Amino acid sequence: MQDLLLAKVESAMQASQVSALAGQTATVTKVSAATNLATITPTAAGQAPIIVKLDATRQVVELQALVGKTVMVGKTPAAIGGIGNWIALTPVTGAKAAAAATGAGQLVMMKVEGTAAAVNLPALAGKSFTIAQPPVAAGTKAAGMLYLNPVGGGDLIAINVQNAATQTGGLVGKTFVVAPSPVIGGTTGKFLVLKPLTAGAGKAVGGGAIAAKFIPAAVTGTGGAAAVGAGSASSLLTAGAGTVTPITAAGTGSAMLSAKGLGLGLGLGLGAWGPFLLGAAGLAGAAALYVWARRRHGTPDLSDDALLAAAGEE
């Protein structure tokens, strides 16, 4: 993101005069440290220079660095909570001018409350967020918090700002990039600056954000749902998994198996499943399984007496 310069000026009239050039280029022709006056001259012929009075010495120094350079004039930031009058200038060179004009949009500015919030503002600069609906319980009023939902996924960020409860409702659902906070009369910026993100970019990234929030929930934790991880569904759908056989109806029972049960299970041609099935089904179940196993291998059925005799010999 190009270096966006926000300057606080003396009056609303000065801010509106500069804002009338929004989307156009201009040159910072003069900045006086003695009077705090700055002269901005439109690039287009026939337009008169605009003189504004800067609010702080720090901003005088910042604009002095732009003297003789071309800037893209932005719309006057929508300052929430009566935090003064501002102008927005973005340095541009050659081909960057067209890109800056295309992405021009009205900035939104609000003052944060509390030192902790101000200290954390630099970490948000350059990142994209969607303004979220305040999580307010029924019958209560929203606190002075602005909720930022990171584009691409992440924890919801709550920032205490002035007049949030009454003047930020129109921002909900919109996506912005956080711009660097201007510093006035101190060492830390106290202003949250939101730059509109293009609709196409916001939708493209936002679609991925939904997946990022829900996918981790399916693979975290130690509960039963988490135990069914990736691959479990395919293992349940392997060939033959849905076939109903007498083994399925063997029931549940003890897993403690004797040597006799092991021998009978293997003798029935059930392989390693024999001990578990016999332990669950008991002697009567073994007889039924014996009949099923003989039919499976094409062996003629035995009489009831022969069947009981075979089971008794084990």
From Swiss-Prot:
Q: What is this protein called?
A: Magnetosome protein MamD
Compartments where located: Magnetosome membrane
Annotated consequence of substituting residue 304 to A: Isolated MIC makes smaller magnetite crystals
Modification comment:
Seen in gels as a band of about 7 kDa, suggesting it may undergo cleavage. Upon overexpression a larger (full-length) protein is seen in the cell inner membrane.
What superkingdom heads the lineage?
Bacteria
Q: Does the keyword Transmembrane helix apply?
A: yes
| Region entry GL repeat, spans | 261-270
- Which residues span the membrane? 264-284
Q: What does the miscellaneous comment read? A: This bacteria makes up to 20 cubo-octahedral magnetosomes of about 45 nm in diameter which contain membrane-bound crystals of magnetite (Fe(3)O(4)).
Topology relative to the membrane, per the entry? Single-pass membrane protein
Q: What happens when the gene is disrupted?
A: Magnetite crystals are elongated and their surface structure is altered. Another deletion missing both mamD and a 25 kb region of the magnetsome island locus (called SID25) gives dumbbell-shaped magnetite crystals. Deletion of the probable mamGFDC operon leads to a slight reduction in magnetic response and slightly narrower magnetite crystals.
Family recorded in the similarity comment: Belongs to the magnetosome MamD/Mms5 family.
